[in-house]
Amino acid sequence: MASNFLTKLFGSRNDRLLKQYRKTVARINAMEPEYEKLSDDALRAKTVEFQGRVARGESLDDLLPEAFAVGREASKRVMKMRHFDVQLLGGMALHHGKISEMRTGEGKTLTATLPVYLNALGGKGVHVVTVNDYLANRDARWMGRLYNFLGLTVGINLPQMPREEKQAAYAADITYGTNNEYGFDYLRDNMVYEARDRVQRALNFAIVDEVDSILIDEARTPLIISGQAEDHTAMYIAMNKVVPLLVRQEGEADPRTGEGVTKPGDFTIDEKSHQVFLTEQGHETAERVLAAQGLIPEGASLYDPSHITLMHHLYAALRANHLYHRDQHYVVQNGEIVIVDEFTGRLMSGRRWSEGLHQAVEAKEGVEIQAENQTLASITFQNYFRLYSKLSGMTGTADTEAYEFQEIYGLETVVIPPNRPSKRDDQLDRVYKTTREKYEAAIQDIRECHERGQPVLVGTTSIENSEIIDDLLNKAGLPHQVLNAKQHAREADIVAQAGRAGMITIATNMAGRGTDIVLGGNIEKEVAAIEDDESLDEATKQARIAALREQWAADNEKVKALGGLRIIATERHESRRIDNQLRGRSGRQGDPGSSRFYLSLDDSLMRIFAGERVRAIMERLKMPDGEAIEAGIVTRSIESAQRKVEARNFDIRKQLLEYDDVANDQRKVIYQQRNEILDAADLSGVIAGMRESCLTDIVRQYVPEESVEEQWDLAGLEKALADEWQIRLPLQQEVESAQAITDGEILEKVVAAGNAAFQAKVDMVGPENFHQFQRAVLLQSFDSNWRDHLSALDYLRQGIHLRGYAQKQPKQEYKREAFELFRQLIDQVKNEVTRILLTVQVQSPSELDQAAEALESRAEQIANVTYTAPTETGEPETLPDPRTAGAGGDGLNLPEGVRIGRNDPCPCGSGKKYKQCHGKLA
């Protein structure tokens, strides 16, 4: 009560904002006469003047009145459209990073041109986000004329585009595209192996059209890129045959004397750390056996750069055969390996070991080796759009979700008044007892409208409902057209004509969004066809266009006299916003119109939330069959039911976000590190830091910090350094010969020895040549471990709710365990990279180049890449890879199963390497 009184006294926050904006509108209007006098060239020159002022430090806020005035004047000349004052208000809200709620037909597309123009002056790029490719293409071409006139460049970002075209689209001042494509490009940019292959710039400013659809309806499902890593089935089988030929060593050798081995062998097992290590004899045996099998050339070393992956497979096979035992660590069930939880003894169906171990166990047991389908990258729309420095959006219906926009995105909603007050008559809902009665009443209403020539739009909540009404109208002999939100371009044409006299159009709620329904029909296509007809002279063109417009004006008046567009809906959507969108398609720009919802007690929303209450009212009133109840109390109880559903859906989205925020913080760290690696000219500092950290960890296992000599296990340390890192250091001798030595000095000696061993490899081929190899090793390790980490987070997320039964907070437990998993990921990358760089045997620069290429190519050879994105209802939908990973998705017609190496000559005959030619498109 008190808040209502204060609002009346001081005005709402919305009123105060609009009052502030109207002062600026007055300034813009005052400039109009001055700008009307400018020539086209002088008006265009204003852009260069503004860009100079921004470069010198003037803020965009200060430029706003002049830039908006220039944008409006240019629109009058190029588009033959003048921005209304309310469109200026909407544009200001967008520039200030708010959501602009403008009713359908108020010209949102034109409104956006002003803040887009203003923000593009900064040179950092503006992204306009639409719900489908058709609208992105249409708006970019339509509004692009205005931007080009003002000297700005426009790009369209579509799927299937080659990389160079995408880069050009993002480099433009203004880029149009869909939410899915922007998100997928961001993920793909964080999977590239060369900085020059990235397509996006820094994310500066985005205006999201139909912001409620994108940031709310589609926010329940994340964008996911998944695929199968390169198929190594043959390699796992081959390695499984090598393992029985290697013999386990019994007893541990003293690094100084070599004594202690009771039976020499090829590998040792460390039960404590669950690891297997090859002995020197084992390396020789393995090399001999692998050469005999044709897996490596005669006389080659396992530590050659080109054989790094062989070591990985050999160790996986050794661990599978000697550390993982059937019916203890796993069981074989229906031809699959199922992991056994070591703590509970339960079977963990669906989970797989990483690092190739699962495939190695499959090879050991002789079951089918499954190429693992992994999540390669994923992000939710909430987290993607929060990466922009400034975000804003526009829609016809945001006010019902204003709380969510503020809570999740920090976006305030500003309700912009219509240019002309609405004359639409929103009639009370009619509720029937049964579905049959509801449909009969709706068809009767449609028939009456059709007989008098009034156009009707029938809105449905699903394709299934559309088909029911389609069938009923066919039986009633009423001509109509059906739209089901699939062919966006055809949709727009049908929706544009839905306002013609006598038209009946059935549409699902989402179909044809972004296209206005003009009373009397839309004649712009016919006008454009006449203008493009080269066989007609100018006078004939003008005469025909004038006749068309005259006919349209008569049709328009006729439809207005009949009551405008009639909206008939046969079900309430679970969101009030979607119902309001449907209503908003009628009564645009002050046109007449009407809407009515026909409901039954059998409708799912009524049945679940409001049915009992309304049924009780009907029974109390003793309503006969076929009679409807039409009362404010019923409509209010339905809206209250919708509010309950909206609140539940908000909680689902909020919970998804709370869990994804954990992964998001980690994603930012990984992607930032990845980008730094890609851009760095010198990685020696990063590598040195990793090496020092690894060697410190290993030293501290055997020589604890601030410990005395009696607590040291120098023999164990020497062995670990030699086995795992190939650092041979006579620490025991040095300690015995030294007067006094501290644990810190031991650590210094080990780090110095590691640095020297590493530097010797760099000196052999030169820092330049070693840089590319280091970078490939780092990126490959980051990527493969990040993929495994995403799978681990998925598994953790699936079972975390069970912690609630143990009186623990699932979200807190998830955060804690996800952090621990992330710490393990960083340690794993550190150890993996350091081990490879310390143990690799370098012979020549060319060999190192080949190894780097092989690593990059292995990382990029991911088969069956699929893209999962939300549909317009928020349900997940799997899309094929628009680029088709590997050869064949690049315009080359290759026989099935043929793959081209990155360094092979391109089959197109250009003479270039495949990676520099058609491989770029793959």
Swiss-Prot record:
The keyword S-adenosyl-L-methionine does not apply. Its EC number is 7.4.2.8. InterPro entries: Helicase_ATP-bd (IPR014001), Helicase_C-like (IPR001650), P-loop_NTPase (IPR027417), SEC_C_motif (IPR004027), SecA (IPR000185), SecA_CS (IPR020937), SecA_DEAD (IPR011115), SecA_motor_DEAD (IPR014018). It is an enzyme of class 7 (translocase). GO terms for cellular component: cell envelope Sec protein transport complex; cytosol; plasma membrane. Signal peptide: none annotated. Its main location: membrane. It catalyses: ATP + H2O + cellular proteinSide 1 = ADP + phosphate + cellular proteinSide 2. SUPFAM superfamilies: Helical scaffold and wing domains of SecA, P-loop containing nucleoside triphosphate hydrolases, Pre-protein crosslinking domain of SecA. It comes from the Bacteria. One of its GO terms (biological process) is protein targeting. It is found in: Cell inner membrane; Cytoplasm. May bind 1 zinc ion per subunit. Keywords: ATP-binding, Cell inner membrane, Cell membrane, Cytoplasm, Membrane, Metal-binding, Nucleotide-binding, Protein transport, Translocase, Translocation, Transport, Zinc. CDD domains: DEXDc_SecA, SF2_C_secA. The keyword Nucleotide-binding applies. ATP binds at residues 87, 105-109, 516. SMART domains: SecA_DEAD (SM00957), SecA_PP_bind (SM00958). It is a peripheral membrane protein. Monomer and homodimer. Part of the essential Sec protein translocation apparatus which comprises SecA, SecYEG and auxiliary proteins SecDF-YajC and YidC. Part of the Sec protein translocase complex. Interacts with the SecYEG preprotein conducting channel. Has a central role in coupling the hydrolysis of ATP to the transfer of proteins into and across the cell membrane, serving both as a receptor for the preprotein-SecB complex and as an ATP-driven molecular motor driving the stepwise translocation of polypeptide chains across the membrane. Belongs to the SecA family. This is Protein translocase subunit SecA. It comes from Paracidovorax citrulli (strain AAC00-1).
